[in-house]
Each structure stands twice: as structure tokens, then as C-alpha cells.
């Protein structure tokens, strides 16, 4: 009886320990899903273009990800980092494409190519950051795809706070500025007849 009780005591203690560990593991909460951001629904500040039939946006491999990227310029200006708990709803190029399609595409004939070269939150100091966007735009003819005009755009917008939401706001503002200035550029370069004729529907 005593030997059986001793055996039970050892096994029972082990079983209780396993159950206790399992119970504690069951109480551990799963990590929260990352917060997701887009560029917002800010309306365009200028009328849409009558020259553009379609927009194509491309980006390098390191920007074809929904990660919200940032850089500590004073620590290592070559290192790109990404927030763990915050991300874009889609890669920046896709978000920019959706914005430009809403603002620019209305039924013209020419095609607009946009190359995103940079899209990052930059920290020159611990308590200061900027949304940095660099873009190249090419207006191409409808028939042959020949380049009619090219222009580069660059933005460095101060973030209201030195964290992921602040970077999102600064980058969204930069895209809004780009959309407005791109529309103005298309209108300007499309004024000469040699560009407006092939771009406008007859």
C-alpha cells in the first residue's frame, strides 16, 4: 500500500506539473496582427487628365512588399529596416497605382509609366523623421509606346511623429503631392499639338 502510494505520488506530481504547464500555455495570448495602412482617401486637388488612358507603376524588388520600411541615416545610411507591428495593406506601388488611377485615368489615349525609386521613412535623428519618395514618370504614345516626355519627382515630407503612424502620414502626404504635381506636369507637356493630338480621343 505504501509502495503503491509512493509510486502514485511521483506520477501524480509529474502529471499535475504537465497539466499546469499546459494550462499556462493555453493562457498565453497569440501575438496581435500587424496594423494595416493605406494612403487614405484624400481627393485630388486638381481636375483629372483628359490625356491618359492608363497608368503603369513599377518598383524595385525591395519595394515590392507591404513592409513599412525605415532607415536610421546617422547609424547606417545603407541599411533598410521594417516595422514588425505595422505594414501597408499592399506594396507601395500598388497603393500608388490605385491613387493615380482614381486621379488621372479618364479616357485619353496615352499611357503613363511611373517608376518608384524610393519609398521610405528616414530618421536623421531619433526624434525626427521624414517620408521620402522618389519617382520617375514617362508619358508614352498610344500607338508605338514612344516616350513623349519624362520627368523626375522627389519629396521629403516631415512626419508629425517619429514612429510608424507618423511615417505613414508623411508618405501618404508625399504621394498626394506627387499626384497633384504629376497632373500639372501632364497638362503642361500635353499643351503642344504634337503631344495633345496623339493623346486626346478624337
Regions found by a protein language model. Give the residues of each.
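Sec-dependent bacterial lipoprotein signal peptides
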Residues: 1-24
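A structural "domain/chain start" motif
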Residues: 24-89, 189-202
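Surface-exposed short loop/turn segments
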Residues: 25-40, 98, 102-144
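Soluble periplasmic/extracytoplasmic beta-strand elements of cell-envelope proteins
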Residues: 51-58, 69-71, 111-117, 132-138, ...
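Short secondary-structure boundary motifs at beta->alpha junctions and helix caps
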Residues: 76-87, 144-184, 188
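Mid-chain, structured segments of secreted extracytoplasmic proteins
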Residues: 78-107
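Sec-exported extracytoplasmic/periplasmic mature domains
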Residues: 101, 105, 183-191
Amino acid at each position: 500500500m505504501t509502495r503503491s502510494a509512493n509510486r502514485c505520488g511521483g506520477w501524480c506530481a509529474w502529471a499535475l506539473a504537465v497539466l499546469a504547464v499546459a494550462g499556462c500555455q493555453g493562457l498565453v495570448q497569440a501575438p496581435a496582427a500587424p496594423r494595416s495602412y493605406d494612403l487614405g482617401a484624400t481627393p485630388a486637388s486638381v481636375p483629372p487628365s483628359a490625356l491618359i488612358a492608363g497608368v503603369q507603376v513599377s518598383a524595385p524588388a525591395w519595394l515590392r512588399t507591404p513592409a513599412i520600411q525605415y532607415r536610421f541615416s546617422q547609424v547606417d545610411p545603407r541599411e533598410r529596416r521594417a516595422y514588425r507591428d505595422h505594414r501597408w495593406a499592399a506594396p507601395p506601388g500598388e497603393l500608388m497605382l490605385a491613387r493615380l488611377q482614381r486621379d488621372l485615368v479618364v479616357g485619353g489615349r496615352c499611357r503613363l509609366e511611373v517608376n518608384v525609386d524610393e519609398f521610405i521613412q528616414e530618421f536623421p535623428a531619433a526624434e525626427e523623421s521624414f517620408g521620402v519618395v522618389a519617382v520617375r514618370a514617362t508619358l508614352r504614345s498610344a500607338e508605338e509606346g514612344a516616350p513623349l516626355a519624362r520627368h523626375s519627382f522627389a519629396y521629403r515630407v516631415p512626419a508629425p511623429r517619429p514612429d510608424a503612424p507618423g511615417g505613414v502620414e508623411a508618405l501618404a502626404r508625399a504621394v498626394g503631392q506627387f499626384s497633384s504635381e504629376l497632373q500639372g506636369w501632364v497638362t503642361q507637356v500635353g499643351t503642344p499639338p504634337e503631344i495633345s493630338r496623339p493623346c486626346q480621343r478624337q
